[in-house]
Amino acid sequence: MSAPASTTQPIGSTTSTTTKTAGATPATASGLFTIPDGDFFSTARAIVASNAVATNEDLSKIEAIWKDMKVPTDTMAQAAWDLVRHCADVGSSAQTEMIDTGPYSNGISRARLAAAIKEVCTLRQFCMKYAPVVWNWMLTNNSPPANWQAQGFKPEHKFAAFDFFNGVTNPAAIMPKEGLIRPPSEAEMNAAQTAAFVKITKARAQSNDFASLDAAVTRGRITGTTTAEAVVTLPPP
């Protein structure tokens, strides 16, 4: 029986070897293997989309529903802005209860407008779409979100006290023609992120992850962790 051929290159040999890898680009690149050049990057147009923001298709569907509800077409945008401004005050979660009726919706309550939105996307995704509009509106009128103090925001960060604040700088949101009156400051961004983290932590503190209802395990508590314990166990900055 002959010995298997050696695949080891002799020591000192100057003969080059070529190694093929699974990720190598073919010599003749076409189709999905095409290599982009500078012209592509300078001329290509990207359509910005975010799964945190309502899409243009979503807005078209909501617009059709609102038309059926007899929301006037000529004030429909203002009705949307009013609703989102209201959400900056009361919140945009699925559990948020809308209050009263805005001045642009032909007597249709904000609750009904929000219910129609939820047939297409989440209320927060809708609010994220108009966050830059509401940001400018609040700054122009020096009117921060109503609950900024209750949420623990400092006065200098009060305009960031709404739960879709991240939409202000999201490129998929609708931007006013003049742009932002001013961009959010780093301190405002940090305050908004901190508030969101604390809110999530408190919500988790209300959940029950016990595997048993035995009092020896639950210690008579309904929730798994108290809010105080949750805050104490927050990771350091």
From Swiss-Prot:
Annotated GO MF terms: structural molecule activity
Keyword entries, A-Z: Capsid protein, Helical capsid protein, Ribonucleoprotein, Virion
Region (Disordered): 1-24
One Pfam family in the UniProt entry: Flexi_CP
GO cellular component, one term: helical viral capsid
Alphabetical list of InterPro entries matching this protein: Pltvir_coat (IPR000052)
Location of the protein in the cell: Virion
Homology family: Belongs to the potexvirus capsid protein family.
Protein purpose: Required for genome encapsidation. Forms ribonucleoprotein complexes along with TGB1 helicase and viral RNA.
Name of the molecule in the record: Coat protein
Organism: Potato virus X (strain UK3) (PVX)
